[in-house]
Design a protein with these regions (language model features):
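RNase H-like, Mg2+-dependent phosphodiesterase core
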Residues: 1-235
Length: 235
């Protein structure tokens, strides 16, 4: 009786995903994360609900969900690393028009820390395209967290850590000026809180990025941003 052919076995490929959280807020750090997972782990995490970190929404429940999933990712991934970029470093690089350069540098550091992988994927096609000349298995694309589980995992890890850091900042000021609503982004809720703080202290809080525009408090403190700012905040 002829033997049955062996089933085809596909390689369990290892992919490193890179993403950030906190590029846009006016308050607090930015966090970059890299996560290396194999295809089996990617499937497991996807079944457990892994998605782009923004898909979970805002608020305490969403933060708790992201933290739980980040813990699951850390337990299952081959490699997880994060870099926290403080507001002072962000300001220094924005003044030189180098925010994108800063992110590429941090991404390079994460890649060099990681084990050898089959593919590296970063979220942000234009932002990270230059790294393709340095790493032959590198690709960058927009909305990568929607298509690649490794990038979604990096997004969740980065966002969970960024939100944890922001919660620590909130607790510093809550008794004095009330909770910072709006996640520290330049939205109406954050603007109201900053207005309350500046009315009381006549200056921006320590964790505020000085290179971000604050027209809603300039009547109280003038423009406290550094001179000769080159705008590259969201490009």
């Amino acid at each position: 009786m002829p033997r049955k052919p062996s089933p085809v076995r596909f390689p369990n490929r290892l992919t490193l995903g890179i993403d950030e959280a906190g590029r846009g807020p006016a308050i607090g750090p930015m966090v970059m994360a890299a996560v290396a997972i194999d295809s089996r782990t990617a499937a497991i995490l996807t079944r457990k609900g892994l998605r782009d970190s923004k898909a979970y929404g805002a608020g305490e429940d969403a933060h708790a969900l992201r933290c739980d999933l980040a813990a699951e990712i850390r337990a299952r991934a081959v490699f997880v690393a994060t870099i926290e970029i403080e507001h002072t470093e962000i300001d220094a690089r924005v003044c030189r028009g180098e925010l994108n350069v800063l992110e590429r540098e941090k991404a390079t550091t994460l890649i060099e820390q990681a084990p050898t992988v089959d593919k590296i994927i970063a979220d942000g096609k234009r932002m990270f395209a230059a790294l393709g000349a340095r790493f032959e298995n590198f690709m960058s694309c927009d909305r990568a967290e929607d298509e690649h589980a490794s990038v979604a995992a990096a997004s969740v890890v980065a966002k969970a850590l960024r939100d944890t850091r922001f919660e620590q900042i909130k607790r510093r000021y809550e008794d004095d000026c009330g909770p910072i609503a709006g996640g520290g982004y330049s939205n109406a809720a954050t603007q109201r809180w900053l207005r309350t703080y500046v009315e009381k202290y006549k200056r921006l809080p320590e964790e505020a990025r000085r290179t971000w525009p604050y027209p809603y408090v300039e009547d109280l403190i003038g423009d406290q941003r550094p001179p000769k700012i080159q705008t590259e905040l969201f490009g």
